[in-house]
Amino acid sequence: MAVENEGVLLVLSSPSGAGKTTILERLLERSTNLVRSVSMTTRKPRPGEINGKDYFFVTKKEFHELCEAGQMLEYARVFENFYGIPKSFIEQNLSSGISVLLSIDWQGAFHLFELMREKVISVFILPPSMEELRLRLQKRNSDSASEIEHRLAEAQKEMSKRDKYDYVVINDDIDKSVEEISSILDKERLKRSGV
C-alpha cells in the first residue's frame, strides 16, 4: 500500500513530434503538486533550451561517470546520444508528496516499470496519423529530410510498444489531451491514496 502523501511518477512517452512537450508544459501549468523531472543528455541543446531547466547538458564522458557511480535512475541511448534521470531528484520529490512528470522514451519507461512499477502511471501519446506526425516534424525546422524519415521509422517501432502502458492518448486536440491526462493523474492519485 502506498504512503498516503507519497507522490507518483507520471511517465509520458511518444514518438518525436506527437506533442509530448506541449502536453507536459500545460500539465505543469495546471498542477501545484507536480514537477517535471529534468533529464540529463549528451545531445546538443536546441534553440531556446536552457541547461538545468530543459535538460542537464553534459559530455558523454561526464554522463558515463555518473552512470558508473550509480547516480542515474535509468538511462538509454537514443539515436547517437544518451539520456538519463538523476536518481536523487525523483526520490526527494516522491517522499515529499510531490508527483514527478517524466518525459522519456519507451526504453526508459520499461526500465522504470521494472524498478518501481507500483509508483508509475504511464501514458503513451499517439499522433492522430503518420501524415500528421510528418507535418509536425517538418514544422519544427530542426531536422533534415533524412532525419525526419529516420524519426518516422523509429515512430513506428515506438508505437508498437504502446500496449505496455497504462493509458494511451491520441493527441488530435491538445486541450483535450491535456484534460484527459490531468484526469488520469487525479484518478490515480486518489486510487493510490486509499480514498
Curated annotation (Swiss-Prot):
GO cellular component: cytosol
Molecular function terms from GO: ATP binding; guanylate kinase activity
Keyword DNA-binding listed: no
Superkingdom in the source lineage: Bacteria
Origin organism lineage: Bacteria, Pseudomonadati, Pseudomonadota, Alphaproteobacteria, Rickettsiales
Domain Guanylate kinase-like: 7-186
Protein name from the UniProt record: Guanylate kinase
Function as written in the Swiss-Prot or TrEMBL entry: Essential for recycling GMP and indirectly, cGMP.
CDD domains: GMPK (cd00071)
Protein residues bound to ATP: S14, P15, S16, G17, A18, G19, K20, T21
Native source species: Wolbachia sp. subsp. Brugia malayi (strain TRS)
Gene: gmk
Subcellular location: Cytoplasm
SS bonds (residue pairs): none
E.C. number: 2.7.4.8
Major location (coarse): cytoplasm
Record InterPro entries: GK/Ca_channel_bsu, Guanylate_kin-like_dom, Guanylate_kinase, Guanylate_kinase_CS, P-loop_NTPase
UniProt-listed NCBIfam families: guanyl_kin
Reaction catalyzed: GMP + ATP = GDP + ADP
Pfam families: Guanylate_kin (PF00625)
Keywords: ATP-binding, Cytoplasm, Kinase, Nucleotide-binding, Transferase
Family: Belongs to the guanylate kinase family.
